[in-house]
Amino acid sequence: MSEKSYVEDIDRSVYDIRDPEHDAFRMQAGLTPDIVDQLSKEKNDPVWMQQFRLHSLQIYNELKVPDWGPSLDGLDIDHIATYVRPNTKMQTNGKNVPQDIKDTFERLGIPQAERKSLAGVGAQYDSELVYHNVKAEVAAQGVVYTDMESALHGEYADMVKKYFMKLVPPTDHKFAALHGAVWSGGSFVYVPKGVEVSIPLQSYFRLNAKGAGQFEHTLIIVDEGASLHFIEGCSAPKYNVANLHAGCVELYVKKNAKLRYSTIENWSKNMYNLNTKRALVEEGGVMEWVSGSFGSHVGCLYPMTILKGDHARMEFTGVTFAGQGQNLDTGAKVVHMGQDTSSYMNTRSISKSGGISTFRSSVVVEKTAKGAKSSVSCQSLMLDSESRSDTIPAMDIRTRDAAVGHEAKIGSISGDAVFYLMSRGMSEEDARALIVSGFADNVSKELPVEYAVEMNNLIRLEMKGSIG
């Protein structure tokens, strides 16, 4: 008789199933001015965006590949198709989405989540959104939740032009420049002054195409006194060639506003995940990051928060699970500019079967940030002797009137704890999985229940076969 797990079991194939590729259009692999110009025409860009793309390409060609983190030698942009258009236009009614794409999102639970607990959903498949919808009562509050292309070409065009890649300019690093040249898809959100969105919005990104890249752009503006919780989910089937994800997230938190940005990333183990996320927080604003990173072959993820206004604050809560063949280099950065600002980073890193997990924290306190407070706590759990976990803190404090602290711990699973749980009827695998889930509860307890269950399921999948 099989033992019942403490969480519902799911099959890894839910994420790894590959749909037949019925693309309406696939750009040739590589990156040239002709390819970027062709993409711009395909997207019907305004002149300023076409020029922005070509300028970003020029910057891309001038910048070097970062060499201070995991090796990116296995990534060759000449073998990556930067744009793949699915065989459908964006729909606002799920019934009109093509059946094969609909089946994929059904397996991933997107429609069920929308019905149960979401104010709006956007679903991107390869390079374009195929579904986007927002509940009428949320739209009635004046909340704007649409795809980036509609915002760029519609009544929010001026707002897009004002904010687009101002927080993350193409000069930031080589993959930011790549994003500026070939971005496609993503979501645009504007929450008006004083509006509190009581249930989350979600965007889900699925990369099905082999040897392709996904470069969605997310732009969120939460106006004065407003609040929002935005959830981002990502997955892809596994191929024997490299795929690339180089999205960009720009978040603007206005005076006394609050934004929580939650991410569950479960990319396939052939993915290079080089996402860039950044937030600008004004006076009295609150920025909360909740991050769970489980997939990809190589991951470089360092959300950055700029605490510009007085009394602004940031919290980052994250968990990373690096298994066999994975090198996940993650962390967070905060820049204190305003007075009496505060930041707190609380992370958990787990590594097994030779996986490498690295946490980088960066705290900058400017001269103007008198009374700033910052605390960083990182705990690492290594499940075997082949795995590796590193913590790399960096602090740049430019005023004496600041309180900054850093704490790091590295450990392994206690044999006594496993024995105790086994004496209560658990298998060794279930006991170890439960301990790891408890270790990562700093993230799961911050998520809506449906997403906490998904995260625990992902941990359980990663733990399978970890005995011995």
Say what each PLM segment does.
Residues R18, P33-D37, D396-I397:
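Short acidic (Asp/Glu) and glycine-rich catalytic loops that position anionic groups and cofactors
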